[in-house]
Amino acid sequence: MSEENQPNYTISQENWSLHRKGYDDQQRHQEKVQEAIKNNLPDLVTEESIVMSNGKDVVKIPIRSLDEYKIRYNYDKNKHVGQGNGDSKVGDVVARDGSGGQKQKGPGKGQGAGDAAGEDYYEAEVSILELEQAFFKELELPNLKRKEIDENRIEHIEFNDIRKTGLWGNIDKKRTMISAYKRNAMRGKASFHPIHQEDLKFRTWNEVLKPDSKAVVLAMMDTSGSMGIWEKYMARSFFFWMTRFLRTKYETVDIEFIAHHTEAKVVTEEEFFSKGESGGTICSSVYKKALELIDNKYSPDRYNIYPFHFSDGDNLTSDNARCVKLVEELMKKCNMFGYGEVNQYNRHSTLMSAYKNIKDENFRYYILKQKADVFHAMKSFFKEESGERMA
């Protein structure tokens, strides 16, 4: 062939399966991230980047249980040889800390400086929606009842069926590709192409009418001087997730925000989550304000009512008997009363001492001692119950 007729291109054959290795590794990594999120959910829900995000779509959170693989030096100074005895099996531990049980110096924690390397952790971008799906899966408003006057019905659309015809906007690409691959494989050529009419799969929906009952949640928080930065952060973390849970799962739930010290007042959501106050503590003031709201706006005949009060338990001692009386009065009008006490050091609580004598099954309390307890408090207050669910 003359030089003029020489082609100006080359044809090469390449193993394209190698090009998918990166995608496969990425998928495995994402699966590990999701598993780590699921296993560390109690610690993740109180991460400051989430609570202070104002509900942004994506946030960065540290996942300390997920290692980022890399070659590490052995910091033990002893000499080693690399030959085994031939008895090793898959899964055997081949390297251990050579300290022999001796106390090792470590990274600095608290007071004092350490001389060892710090612990690396993986920082992942996670959507709030992913956390909500994992967190809210088993939560519901307890004792939710259908009110006599209220006949609201919620129209809900569920994509729960696959058909061979439908709108092109609803085509299920994954199922279509799988169907084409199976058909081509049966003909001796495992490939995603060509795609025939018989391979097409479309998602279709059904309109579901669900009975709905109105509800109101009274979010009450102690903002007195005894509530320190950590106590207020814990209380606001709980109410942050509570409001997102209610607005995600229920379409007709009102939320009233009440802050108190010696006096109680209804505040906006922004003020509730950002404004700091001081002063003494008279918890009965917030219960009086809650009863006033119920009498003026939220009749028990039309609303399911859920008061939630968070405090550090440091109340004026002479006010405790009045608090118990008002809580019992509230429970006559409410479906459930929840009290959360932020008590990190297990100190004596005048308010909890009084509340422990309340025997009503609709009174629930939870003592929060560490950040993970926000997750457990949500599970305790909003646990799923047997019987008819109304959402």
Curated annotation (Swiss-Prot):
In this chain, composition skew of type Gly residues spans 98-115
Q: Which family does it belong to?
A: Belongs to the UPF0229 family.
Annotated NCBIfam families: spore_yhbH
- Mind telling me which Pfam families this protein's record contains? DUF444 (PF04285)
Q: Where is this region: Disordered?
A: 1-31, 80-117
Compositional bias (Basic and acidic residues): 21-31
Protein's recorded name: UPF0229 protein BcerKBAB4_0466
Provide ranges: composition bias, Polar residues. 1-16
By its UniProt entry, which InterPro entries does this protein fall under? Answer: Spore_YhbH, UPF0229
